[in-house]
């Protein structure tokens, strides 16, 4: 990230897509990691967060559902949270366009009373597979250092069986 991109110099927080081919060529351990699960990378990105405003409640865009996140830097003091939202509320949520041009649910209008916490991972220390269509957020609880950086990967052959 430091040697091959200007991402850390950018004031833009949140998602930053990477050149997957270049990334896999320069980080052979990633190739080995994904090969052991027979996964073929479709997209790769890093998420950069320095505050609770950077990765608020959201649902990732389709078509890919199963994603793998790998901690890169400064995940201590951060919490990944997944929520259930009442269907009557979710059905009324307006759509907006994200900065990549995708039509996405605008979950900033969902009242906190309509959220039920389903799962929480604090201080992510190892890779995790998750369903990116479940509403989720990243919350700064007591960050030890900034910025929080996590690599995210989607696959041509989604690891749906790992979601079980």
Residue ranges with predicted function:
Residues 1-63:
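Signature of the catalytic double-stranded beta-helix
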Residues 7-8, 139-148:
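Short, surface-exposed loop and linker segments with low hydrophobicity and enrichment for Pro/Ser/Thr
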Residues 34, 80, 118, 159-164:
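Generic hydrophobic, helix-prone segments enriched in Leu/Val/Ile
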Residues 39-127:
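Catalytic core of non-heme Fe(II) oxygenases with the double-stranded beta-helix
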Residues 55-58, 130-143:
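Short beta-strand His + acidic residue motifs that chelate non-heme Fe in jelly-roll/DSBH
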Residues 66-71, 127-131, 144-162:
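A short hydrophobic beta-strand segment most commonly corresponding to one strand
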Residues 75-77, 135-137, 156-158:
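Short Gly/Pro-enriched loop/turn and capping motifs at secondary-structure junctions
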Residues 113, 138, 160-164:
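Active-site or metal-binding loop neighborhoods of secreted/extracellular toxin and effector enzymes
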